[in-house]
């Protein structure tokens, strides 16, 4: 499925278009991190499927008016995976290719962790867990102040490290208590951190924990687009805050780094990128 033109792209069926677009996003992530010689490629590749479906099919946003009051909010709590968001914001029309090429450069719109100066970014994030609290605060403010019949959602994208932080769990208890039905969190459960597998340091059953805190809980294959769609529809109709726990594979689609902590916080080698692009047919 090697397609380099819009004409070829339009000949694809919907599933092929989705797959190709996700693979292109992964290519942008790998190239951006490699060009900066710094960053985190593995996490964006595990989170790419959910985030693509979210942005392309569910978010209420307007790239021509990034600060539109009636937009949904997205908080990337797992801020070090920001090359994923920048790549998607580029495809949505918020950013330019030069912005991606300037990833992690001083003064750019694409710093190493998200900042609200970047069009389409709703929160400064970096310290793990902080974005969970920020997203819950946004959802509470929206619920308290909304004077519109349009239900606006706050989405949090979180990873293993986020939910290991007390700030995230403390805020989550409040979200359940306040029944913030306009809050949806995706937990990218790839079970890998920079030093190894999460089982080395954490055995928490987060599905049971969030259920006990009063959340609507779903567990899905985080790479299955149909499961992602259904989980988002269910979450949007819940009368509780929702957590979607997606079992994913770090560096999904890479040539040799799937499941590997080596993919977490270092650029892929040129050979790995080349072989991965061949595998993904991009």
Identify what each model region corresponds to.
Residues 2-153:
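Thiamine diphosphate
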Residues 61-64, 114-282:
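Glycine-rich ThDP/TPP pyrophosphate-binding loop and its adjacent helix/strand module
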């Amino acid at each position: 499925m090697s397609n380099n033109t819009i004409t070829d792209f339009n000949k694809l069926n919907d599933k092929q278009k989705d797959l190709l677009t996700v693979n292109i996003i992964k290519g942008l992530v790998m190239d951006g991190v490699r060009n900066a010689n710094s960053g985190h490629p593995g996490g964006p590749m595990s989170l790419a499927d959910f985030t693509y479906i979210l942005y392309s099919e569910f978010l209420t946003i307007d790239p021509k008016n990034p600060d539109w009051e009636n937009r949904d909010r997205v908080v990337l709590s797992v801020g070090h995976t920001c090359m994923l968001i920048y790549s998607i914001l580029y495809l949505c029309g918020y950013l330019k290719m030069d912005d991606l090429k300037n990833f992690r450069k001083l003064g750019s719109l694409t710093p190493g962790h998200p900042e609200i100066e970047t069009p389409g970014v709703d929160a400064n994030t970096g310290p793990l867990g902080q974005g969970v609290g920020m997203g819950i605060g946004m959802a509470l403010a929206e619920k308290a102040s909304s004077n519109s019949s349009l239900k606006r959602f706050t989405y949090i994208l979180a990873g293993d490290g986020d939910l290991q932080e007390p700030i995230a769990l403390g805020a989550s208890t409040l979200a359940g208590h306040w029944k913030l039905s306009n809050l949806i969190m995706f937990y990218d459960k790839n079970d890998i951190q920079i030093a190894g597998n999460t089982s080395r340091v954490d055995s928490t059953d987060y599905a049971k924990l969030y259920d006990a805190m009063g959340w609507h809980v779903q567990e899905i294959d985080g790479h299955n687009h149909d499961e992602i769609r259904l989980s988002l529809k269910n979450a949007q109709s819940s009368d509780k805050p929702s957590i979607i726990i997606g079992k994913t594979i770090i560096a999904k689609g890479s040539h040799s780094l799937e499941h590997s902590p080596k993919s977490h916080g270092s650029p892929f080698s040129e050979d790995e990128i080349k072989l991965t692009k061949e595998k993904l047919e991009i």
